[in-house]
Amino acid sequence: MEGIIKAICISKQKGTEKHPVQDIEIIEDHGLEKDAHAGKWHRQVSLLSYEKREEFKAKGANVEDGAFGENLLVSGIEFTSYPVGTQFKMGDVLLELTQIGKSCHSHCAIYHQVGQCIMPRQGVFTRVIHGGHICVGDKVEVIENK
C-alpha cells in the first residue's frame, strides 16, 4: 500500500490548529522540527487520511490543512485499518504506529472552531524510528507487521 503526503503541518502550541509547510526535518525519537507535539513520548507525529478529511468537508465543514491538529495529511492510506506496530516509510523517515485514535477529555480549540473533531476516531499517532527530510508530494509506504 502506498500513499502521498498532501500536507505537512506544525504548530507552536498544543490544542491549536497547525499551519502547513512545504517540507520539514523529522528528528529521530522526537518528531517534526518546531512542532509543539514533538518530544520523547509515543505521539511524536500524528497522521490523518486525506480522504477522511474530505468526507468531513463534504458534510459542510470548512476545514483546512492542519485544522484537526494533524502533522501529516496523507492520501491513499486508511491508517485506522492497520494495527499498532505498523511502520510507514517516507524516504529515509521511518515512523511506527503507536496509537489509533485518542480521547478528547475536554473540547479543545479545534472542537470549538469546527464543531467536532475527527482525530479521536480517524487520527493515528506514531513515534519516529529514523529521521530525515520530507516534502509535500513524497510517497508513503506501508510496512506491515509480519
Which sequence ranges carry the predicted segments?
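Metal-cofactor-dependent catalytic cores
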Residues: 1-146
